[in-house]
């Protein structure tokens, strides 16, 4: 189960620092909010406390940290060729070559990617949030499409989650069988949940956890699509306010 809880860590910070201009921003929409809230309640109030969280606690407490790091490095290394292609598609050949170098060094010298040799050798080759095909679409202004909460999966939009399926067309991801892909997805989901166990209070303290999760999801993907930059939101009434101020000054 992939609940996209990693959005909370970055998204909560962004929500504090950025104003939001509504769910229609950058193609955001939530036409199925009633259904989504029902699925959210199932995912986060039934599935998470009784299945996902206990597994994540056991993973954190009993799996050695070096083993967790190695598995995370390995699954991340599988995505490096697709990330490289997406940077080229976004017109950023420098970052594309950075990820080519990461894949080459970590695969050859890092035991197939279990050791992040590249990141240890050069700070400029540190592992970063992967740019998937959904991020490329966002880079060119493609809207998210309807937001949906899926059972056992969590937050989903056609652009970022559906678009990411295109990454599976590139090696090494294209070489994975269906069971291998499920195993990768499961490992990533458990590791993400384990990393956020200490942040559970964020949701419990929120007046509307569903809105918090939804907006954190959008903020996180906006941040990635914008190349790690926070773009100020334009006030739709800014021009009218400026005109009023000019009228006052002219009097």
Label for each model-derived stretch:
Residues 14-35:
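Bacterial Sec signal peptide processing site at the extreme N-terminus
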Residues 71-74:
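Beta-rich strand-turn-strand
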Residues 77-158:
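Mid-length scaffold segments of soluble, non-membrane domains
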Residues 131, 135-251:
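A structured, mid-to-C-terminal "fold-capping" secondary-structure block
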Residues 1-5:
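Positively charged n-region of N-terminal signal peptides that target proteins for export
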Residues 31-65:
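Post-signal-peptide N-terminal segment of Sec-exported extracytoplasmic proteins
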């Amino acid at each position: 189960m992939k609940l996209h809880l990693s959005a909370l860590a970055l998204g909560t910070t962004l929500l504090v620092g950025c104003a939001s201009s509504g769910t229609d921003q950058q193609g955001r929409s939530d036409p199925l909010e009633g259904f989504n809230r029902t699925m959210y309640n199932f995912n986060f109030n039934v599935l998470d406390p009784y299945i996902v969280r206990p597994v994540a606690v056991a993973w954190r407490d009993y799996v050695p940290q070096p083993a967790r790091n190695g598995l995370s490095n390995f699954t991340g290394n599988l995505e490096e060729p697709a990330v490289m292609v997406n940077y080229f598609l976004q017109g950023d050949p420098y970052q594309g070559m950075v990820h080519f170098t990461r894949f080459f060094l970590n695969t050859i010298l890092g035991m197939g990617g279990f050791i992040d040799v590249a990141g240890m050798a050069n700070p400029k080759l540190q592992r970063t949030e992967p740019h998937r095909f959904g991020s490329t679409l966002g880079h060119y202004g493609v809207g998210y499409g309807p937001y949906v909460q899926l059972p056992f999966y969590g937050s989903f939009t056609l652009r970022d989650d559906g678009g990411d399926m295109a990454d599976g067309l590139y090696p090494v991801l294209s070489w994975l069988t269906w069971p291998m892909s499920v195993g990768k997805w499961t490992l990533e989901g458990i590791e993400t949940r384990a990393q956020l166990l200490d942040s559970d209070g964020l949701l419990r303290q929120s007046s509307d956890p569903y809105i918090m999760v939804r907006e954190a999801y959008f903020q996180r993907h906006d941040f990635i699509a914008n190349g790690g930059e926070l773009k100020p939101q334009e006030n739709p009434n800014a021009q009218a306010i400026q005109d009023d101020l000019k009228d006052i000054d002219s009097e």
